[in-house]
Each structure stands twice: as C-alpha cells, then as structure tokens.
Amino acid sequence: GLVSSIGRALGGLLADVVKSKEQPA
C-alpha cells in the first residue's frame, strides 16, 4: 500500500544518509 511504499522510500533515504556518514566521499 501507499504507507508501506513511503516507509520503504524513507528507509532507503535513511540508509543512504547513514552510509554516507560512515563512508564520506
């Protein structure tokens, strides 16, 4: 559903932020 799609998108963004903090370019 819409909520799970939004949750998945937010989870992906959060993972990207954490990953970029752990491994700065």
UniProtKB/Swiss-Prot annotation:
InterPro entries: Frog_Litoria. One of its GO terms (cellular component) is extracellular region. It comes from the Eukaryota. GO terms for biological process: defense response to bacterium. It is found in: Secreted. Expressed by the skin parotoid and/or rostral glands. Keywords: Amphibian defense peptide, Antibiotic, Antimicrobial, Secreted. Signal peptide: none annotated. It holds the Pfam family Antimicrobial24. Antimicrobial peptide, that adopts an alpha helical conformation which can disrupt bacterial membranes. Each caerin displays a different antimicrobial specificity. Belongs to the frog skin active peptide (FSAP) family. Caerin subfamily. This is Caerin-2.2. It comes from Ranoidea gilleni.
